[in-house]
Amino acid sequence: MSTSTTPQNAVVLLSGGLDSVTCLYWAKANYANVTAVSFNYGQRHNSELNAAKKIAATAQVNHRIIGIDLAQLGGSALTDVSLVVPDAKQTDFSDNQHNDSIPITYVPARNTIFLSYALALAEVTQSNAIVIGVNAVDYSGYPDCRPEYIAAFEKMANLATKAGVMGNHLHIATPLLHLSKAEIIKLGVSLGVDYALTVSCYRADSEGRACGHCDSCFLRQQGFLQAEIDLSLIHI
């Protein structure tokens, strides 16, 4: 069994968005060595991937970009340009109650696929933590952002890896799980995050400029308004 109780190395899933950059800086504050991993998975635009590159360079962390063509599978407005990304007004955000329906922006099994690659990278880099920016408060109905999903994946990870069976427990860290978007932004600011580098929009253009109307833009807008922090960053 492993005698170490202090995590040293972490792999961070970095999309280029607001949540993932906050996770990256949180990991830098809590782990000795951090590797960021991003995915070119056939998303609508490369602007978020370009943002991830800039963020990783600014944070001075190792950065891996892995190609996975989820566009071949389709099934999501984020990977199939024939599907329309809806405006936020078509989604019920009242009282933070999640709609029972799963939105068209859900990418089938995306977090499971991404976490599986991150798990392999964690073994290669001898990391005992994977950090992911899932959120159970503003999660928009995605099934792979729920606490029970994360717990199940962590259990599987420790059954399915050499490190796990040798007693080196791997933890799926979710520092944003129970935070509101405003609380996430405040945390990031306290850690030195430059949110001007991030791309949140589902319909961002090639330069990363936001549409200001989609689900993700709405949550970002509400977060900055409630946090009362630099409103010029709302539509970036």
Task: Report residues per predicted region.
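Secondary-structure transition/capping residues
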Residues: 129, 164, 195, 225-228
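Short cysteine/histidine-rich zinc-coordinating motifs and their immediately flanking basic loops
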Residues: 213, 223-232
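Conserved S-adenosyl-L-methionine
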Residues: 66-68, 194-203
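ATP-dependent adenylation/nucleotidyltransferase module used to activate substrates
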Residues: 2-191
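Conserved small/polar residues in nucleotide/adenosyl-binding loops
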Residues: 234-236
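Local cysteine-cluster metal-coordination motifs and their immediate loop/turn environment
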Residues: 199-222
